[in-house]
Amino acid sequence: MSSYQSEYNADEQAAIDKEFTRLANNKSIYLDHAGTTLYAESQVTAAAEQLQRDVICNPHTCRVTGDYVDQVRFKLLEFFNTKEDEYHVIFTANATAALSLVAENFDFGRQGNFHYCQENHTSVLGMRERVQARAMYMLKEEEITGMASVPSAANGVSGSSPGDNSLVTFSAQCNFSGYKIPLAAIAGIQKQGLPHGLGKKISGEAPQTTDNNNYYVCLDAASFVATNPLDLQRYRPDYVCISFYKIFGYPTGVGALLVSRRGAEAFRKKRNFFGGGTINYAYPHAMDHQLREVFHQRYEDGTLPFLSIVGLLEGFRTLERLVPRRSVNGGDVATMERISRHVHGLAQHLEKQLRQLKYPNGQPLIELYNRVGYEERHRQGGIVAFNVRTDAGPFVGFGEIACVAALQGILLRTGCFCNIGACQRYLGLDETMMDAIYKRAGRICGDYYDLIDGQPTGAVRVSFGYMTRRQDVDELLKMLHLSYLATKPQQRLQLIEEQAGELPKALKERAQRLRPQLLQLAIYPVKSCAAFKIEEGGGSGGGGSGGTWPLTAQGLQYDREWMIVDMNGMAVTQKRCSELCLIRPLIRDDQLVLHFGDSPDGVSLPLSLADQAENSSRCRSKVCRQPVEGLDCGDEVALWLSQHLGLEGLRLLRQSSQRSTTNGVRQQQKLSLVNQAQFLLVNRSSVRSLQFEESLDETVDRFRANIIIDTGSAFEELSYKQLTIGQVQFQVEGPCQRCDMICINQRTGERSPETLTTISRLQSGKMRFGIYISRISTENNKESQHLTCGDVVVVT
């Protein structure tokens, strides 16, 4: 049972619920308060009534409007427990604009550095483009947290000493995970600076010493102040950046930069730009102007969004009315403190329940991303980030979760939440993996490319506001249980497809990709030699227009059409000569070209069977005890093979007569020189579960499959009976019983016996991996079909 206790009494909860009836009317459960909280109905009604009642015009025209704006400044300072003689309030468009203002105007001098936390909003990374620092350093969260224990003056430092200035920027609360960096680090940094060599240098020239530098702190408080009190009497950052819609839900388009008196001293005396309202005068006929004396007036370019600013007053009133101060155990608990308790309690409840969600085999459903747990409110806020796993362990893409949630009316957030550094940290992405995701795979911020080779590129985030109810959290838990623990993957995908028309446009596109897709085709022109791969966008080495490859009556065109035999006419395989895997085929310009390893020199053969037959003698061999008839491909290629493989008397044969076998649906299936069936299918999820210490592509190559797919669950292919890829129907012939050939690394020829033992362990002693499939032939598809990488795989 959960230990959750409501922060609100019954009357308070009823009053809050009355303000958000639109959620029930729209059958919506809102769980993205870190994105924006929701506005109360009475809040926007009162704001609209004021606009209808009062004459609110340009503050340069009407002093009344200016008075309203000043009221908001005073109220904001009171909200953060400070006064106008300690902090200036500069109105901006949002927290991003506030960060930009700091970056543009902070005076680093000649030796000052810019330091920022890895787990920061993208806008902090954007500051790097504008700061004029000598060097830039990325700090890990624990490096900043460590500064909280540095002995320092209780309230930081009051001023600056001669010397240059360094700036440290971090988020009070991580918008990815909800982790709160101890604000005591602010005074530690201001008083002691940062230890020399702390952090990773990203750019610039490291100064010989920073001992004389003054250290300033820019606090990105946008996520934090939405649900937590910020006491600027206790903690005194030099700059505080906020967005009001995070706190009140309405209005949007207005934020603020709070600048301490100390922080103001570190701003440049001259600006690179000035707008209307920021100057005493500016001559058009000469480069002469004078900025305003009042600090905030120098930086509020142009006319302020005064209607939005006036609307903030009702936001403050609404919070204080719906979540009033109350006495607890003789102490006074203010509005934001109560909201902090409320959202933390919900997050704690959710985290405990998520940990209890498990599959029948004991596999946890949820992978949580959290630094310190949910026991301490001063360390963790009302945000829970996670991913979902299958019963076999691989991840489910966050795009699928977004689809399932949307169909249940649950609004949550997926991706990296404009915090790639936190994604990198929590998902364990090294620099190579980051390049693979963003540069090679082409993922961009905000898209739904959620899994790359089974690696999540983001997460699912739920976050809470003062109006979130426990019932909302329980509905999320119910969705996860019913959709994942009580429903099989194929049923879930079918339900999503049936209701896809109800999804937003971006999710409709993601829903279309939920079905497994054909990732890659591989043909092995010469039996037991390397593959020629066909991938989306075109085949390797120029084969397969657009990733498409034709089918013949025997399978994929040119697959296992040639084989190498010894002087006795017996087929040579990798069991006897592992170096066969180094013979790499290339199909182009009506030629089959063979190379050995990375050598540019090779030998060519015509693809046309008619051209080959004119000058070739016929001979016989056997494949799996069945006689086959073939054409000898000549002395040139025979000599080339013997030289590279070190075996005398080798010949290359090309199949000239068809083989056939009876499959499970009692059809005569025509075969090439394959051992058992027309096609071998392998699931990358199953390969991934082996967890070999080599690249996933290398492991996939070991299984020498023709058709490579990727599904949500490892080994689910073993349960298939029939499937359709694109427009082509297939019958499953059964699992592929493996031999020690899979112990050979297909890129090097080296053997590693643990491959077989791992499969045996995962399959309870059985040596099964991949499935044999055959095309279901009809009168309409005998000669005209093809497969294309990207085709959807439907299991029937």
Swiss-Prot record:
Key word Phosphoprotein present: yes
Molecular function via GO: lyase activity; molybdenum cofactor sulfurtransferase activity; molybdenum ion binding; pyridoxal phosphate binding
The MOSC domain, residue ranges: 650-796
Keyword Transferase found: yes
Pfam families: Aminotran_5, MOSC, MOSC_N
Enzymatic class: transferase
Family as reported in the entry's similarity comment: Belongs to the class-V pyridoxal-phosphate-dependent aminotransferase family. MOCOS subfamily.
Sites of Phosphoserine modification: 752
Required cofactor(s): pyridoxal 5'-phosphate
Enzyme nomenclature, EC number: 2.8.1.9
Name of this chain's protein: Molybdenum cofactor sulfurase
Chain's role: Sulfurates the molybdenum cofactor. Sulfation of molybdenum is essential for xanthine dehydrogenase (XDH) and aldehyde oxidase (ADO) enzymes in which molybdenum cofactor is liganded by 1 oxygen and 1 sulfur atom in active form.
Catalytic reactions of this protein: Mo-molybdopterin + L-cysteine + AH2 = thio-Mo-molybdopterin + L-alanine + A + H2O
GO biological process, one term: molybdopterin cofactor metabolic process
Entry keywords, A to Z: Molybdenum cofactor biosynthesis, Phosphoprotein, Pyridoxal phosphate, Transferase
Active-site annotation: 418
List of residues that carry N6-(pyridoxal phosphate)lysine: 246
